[in-house]
């Protein structure tokens, strides 16, 4: 079950990074 928690953590970090990238792109366009 420990690897599942690790995957969840990685998923959260990846999600935050993706959101940050999208916000940067939107901010650069506007």
UniProtKB/Swiss-Prot annotation:
Its main location: secreted. Signal peptide: none annotated. Keywords: Amphibian defense peptide, Antibiotic, Antimicrobial, Fungicide, Secreted. GO terms for biological process: defense response to bacterium; defense response to fungus; killing of cells of another organism. InterPro entries: Dermaseptin_dom. It is found in: Secreted. It comes from the Eukaryota. One of its GO terms (cellular component) is extracellular region. Pfam families: DD_K. Expressed by the skin glands. Belongs to the frog skin active peptide (FSAP) family. Dermaseptin subfamily. Monomer and oligomer. Forms aggregates in aqueous environments. Potent antimicrobial peptide with activity against bacteria and protozoa. Also has activity against fungi. Probably acts by disturbing membrane functions with its amphipathic structure. Binds to healthy erythrocytes (this binding is receptor independent), but has very weak hemolytic activity. Does not bind to P.falciparum infected erythrocytes, but accumulates within the parasite. Kills the parasite, but has no hemolytic activity on the host cell. This is Dermaseptin-S3. It comes from Phyllomedusa sauvagei (Sauvage's leaf frog).
């Amino acid at each position: 079950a420990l690897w599942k928690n690790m995957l969840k953590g990685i998923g959260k970090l990846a999600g935050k990074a993706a959101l940050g990238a999208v916000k940067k792109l939107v901010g650069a366009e506007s």
